[in-house]
């Protein structure tokens, strides 16, 4: 008499069609992005300070306005970037077609190039594409999406509005002694913030997968 079959459980990495390397890369990328978001949230200043009406005044000169922008960005940079990110998200949500194109482009880069195992060539319609051909197709697709559709103009116009808003707020908000000395040693600049947080977080996960694609 045959023994009864016992129920078995399957871990997520053992699901049919699941790629452990892909799942691991996605987990690393997601964890680093979440860590970056938490770090940015921890760096954010109280929003009441950002909109304190008593701290606003007209700058007496252009040099003073420039100095205010630099100091305010150094202090409120996490708040500013959060607001610009929200503005970008809202702009994309109000343009579903642009959001679909941008999401499809990002997914193509992730799943067809960065997270695709190096020993599994891309096959479409029975044709095998090399890494160089795949990279060329993705680059061409990026150019088409960014410069021949509404995605590029939408992103650039939204960023321009966000940066203009940051500049106006920074120029008219008089810096307070509370944070002048505290932030004097911190280098100002949008690229420095992204390089130390978001770029390092996403690049670390993507670079690990991309380096595995280099064939001897």
Swiss-Prot record:
Keywords: Acetylation, Endoplasmic reticulum, Membrane, Transmembrane, Transmembrane helix, Transport. Its main location: endoplasmic reticulum. The keyword Transmembrane applies. Pfam families: PRA1 (PF03208). The modification N-acetylalanine is found at residue 2. One of its GO terms (cellular component) is endoplasmic reticulum membrane. Interacts with PRA1B1, PRA1B2, PRA1B3, PRA1B4, PRA1B5 and PRA1E. This is PRA1 family protein B6.
């Amino acid at each position: 008499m045959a023994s009864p079959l016992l129920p078995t459980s399957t871990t997520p990495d053992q699901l049919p069609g699941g790629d452990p390397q892909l799942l691991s890369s996605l987990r690393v990328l997601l964890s680093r992005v979440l860590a970056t978001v938490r770090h940015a949230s921890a760096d954010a200043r109280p929003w009441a300070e950002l909109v304190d009406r008593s701290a606003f005044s007209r700058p007496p000169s252009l040099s003073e306005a420039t100095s205010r922008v630099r100091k305010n960005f150094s202090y409120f940079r996490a708040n500013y970037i959060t607001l610009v990110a929200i503005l970008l998200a809202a702009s994309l949500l109000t343009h579903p077609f642009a959001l679909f194109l941008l999401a499809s482009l990002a997914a193509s880069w992730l799943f067809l190039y960065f997270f695709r195992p190096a020993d599994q060539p891309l096959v479409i319609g029975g044709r095998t594409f090399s890494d160089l051909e795949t990279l060329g197709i993705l680059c061409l697709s990026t150019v088409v999406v960014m410069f021949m559709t509404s995605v590029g103009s939408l992103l650039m116009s939204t960023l321009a509005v966000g940066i203009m808003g940051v500049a106006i707020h920074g120029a008219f908000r008089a810096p307070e002694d509370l944070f002048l000395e505290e932030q004097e040693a911190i280098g100002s600049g949008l690229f420095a913030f992204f390089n130390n947080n978001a770029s390092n977080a996403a690049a670390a996960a993507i670079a690990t997968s991309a380096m595995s694609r280099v064939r001897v």
